[in-house]
């Protein structure tokens, strides 16, 4: 019994090391280990999912879906992983997979096909690299606000460059994404500044952002060449972003 418990504990540790969810075949288990996995499912220590995936109870649903499809998280789910801001609202998990005929959606997840996209190692978090995820977000999202907020933050923090993103914008939605990229700014210091720029652009008003004024310092926006707009107070700007 002690030996069986030790094997069970080892298997649970392995699944935990795969961010809580893994496709069984990716573990290359022995027949005995597979029997122990089945036993762990029966006792509720593991949960069985579609297409041979098991997870720990409470595993992140987005990770479970990524393992089911053998894909990588992208768009808003990737922004959450990279701790980039976006407009809050209903969130669907978007995944990038390399094979369009692999598996149908098992819920409300959105599947993007990119034949050049590889799959993550079971021990790696299943997410696209940040430049690729941002490029996909710019192409995919229906509204301008979320992708621009995330992109502005990534540019401001020097985590990506505009040129990196531009070079990745190919395929459906790229024209819209390029237009969004042209409106991005590495000088925005908060989502509120991004949203204000969007409103000014929609109103047809000219503006500059992140303007240095002698004797004052940097201000958020100068509208129509003379109206100074300061959006965020000290409480917001004293944090890291």
List the model feature ranges, each with a label.
Residues 1-173, 209:
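Short gly/ser-rich loop at a beta-strand->alpha-helix junction or flexible surface loop bordering the NTP-binding
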């Amino acid at each position: 019994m002690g030996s069986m418990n030790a094997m069970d504990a080892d298997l649970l540790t392995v699944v935990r090391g795969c961010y809580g969810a893994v496709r069984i075949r990716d573990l290359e288990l022995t027949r005995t280990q597979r029997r122990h996995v089945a036993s762990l499912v029966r006792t509720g220590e593991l949960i069985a999912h579609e297409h041979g995936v098991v997870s720990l109870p409470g595993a992140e649903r987005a990770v479970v879906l990524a393992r089911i499809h053998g894909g990588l998280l992208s768009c808003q789910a990737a922004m959450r992983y990279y701790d980039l801001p976006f407009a809050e609202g209903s969130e669907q998990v978007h995944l990038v997979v390399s094979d369009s005929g692999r598996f149908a959606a098992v819920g409300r997840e959105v599947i993007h096909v990119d034949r050049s996209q590889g799959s993550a190692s079971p021990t790696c978090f299943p997410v696209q690299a940040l430049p690729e995820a941002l490029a996909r977000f710019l192409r995919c999202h229906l509204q301008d606000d979320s992708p621009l907020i995330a992109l502005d933050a990534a540019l401001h923090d020097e985590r990506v460059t505009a040129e990196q993103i531009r070079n990745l914008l190919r395929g459906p939605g790229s024209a819209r994404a390029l237009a969004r990229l042209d409106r991005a700014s590495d000088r925005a210091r908060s989502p509120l500044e991004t949203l204000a720029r969007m409103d000014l652009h929609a109103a047809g008003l000219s503006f500059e952002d992140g303007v240095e004024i002698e004797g004052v310092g940097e201000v958020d926006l100068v509208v129509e060449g003379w109206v100074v707009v300061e959006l965020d107070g000290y409480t917001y700007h004293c944090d890291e972003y």
